[in-house]
Design a protein with these regions (language model features):
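Sec-dependent signal peptide recognition
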Residues: 2-8
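N-terminal signal peptide c-region/cleavage motif recognized by signal peptidases
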Residues: 10, 15-17
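Cleaved targeting-peptide boundary
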Residues: 19-28
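Extended, polar beta-sheet/loop recognition surfaces of beta-rich domains
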Residues: 27, 36, 40-47, 101-114
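Short, surface-exposed alpha-helix to beta-strand junction/turn motifs within ectodomains of secreted
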Residues: 41-66
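Short beta-strand segments within Ig-like beta-sandwich modules, predominantly Fibronectin type-III
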Residues: 69-74
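Exposed aromatic-hydrophobic patches
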Residues: 79-83
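A glycine-anchored, Pro-Gly-centered beta-turn/N-cap motif
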Residues: 86-95
Length: 114
């Protein structure tokens, strides 16, 4: 018994920390939304992002990068600021890395209406 108690006391020190991945919780505009040209596109993640390893592209219906859409990382938010977008379908292709250093990728589309 004298040997078991010290060993049990050390168990919490051996367990690694529990990390969650940086999952996309929601976006503005939402996936499949039909909106007027947005002034910004905001992605809300489940944890703060590592700015050096996270980012996004805004693509038009032909898969071309829409220029002028800088990306800002602010904690769990990823914000794209495109210029005025003509009507059409757009796709946001994102990748995120949280504090656990695991990369997640995803995308969603929305439509800019006339």
């Amino acid at each position: 018994m004298k040997r078991i108690l010290p060993a049990l006391a050390l168990l919490p020190l051996l367990a690694g920390p529990a990390f969650a991945h940086s999952h996309l919780l929601k976006s503005e505009p939402a996936a499949n939304a039909k909106v007027r040209s947005p002034g910004h596109i905001t992605l809300h993640f489940s944890e703060s992002l590592e700015p050096a390893f996270s980012g996004a592209l805004l693509l038009d219906k032909d898969g071309r990068n829409v220029s002028g859409a800088p990306v800002k990382i602010d904690g769990p938010l990823m914000i794209l600021t495109p210029g005025p977008l003509p009507p059409g379908v757009y796709k946001v292709s994102w990748h995120s890395v949280g504090h656990d250093t695991h990369r997640l990728d995803g995308n969603f589309s929305f439509t800019v209406k006339p």
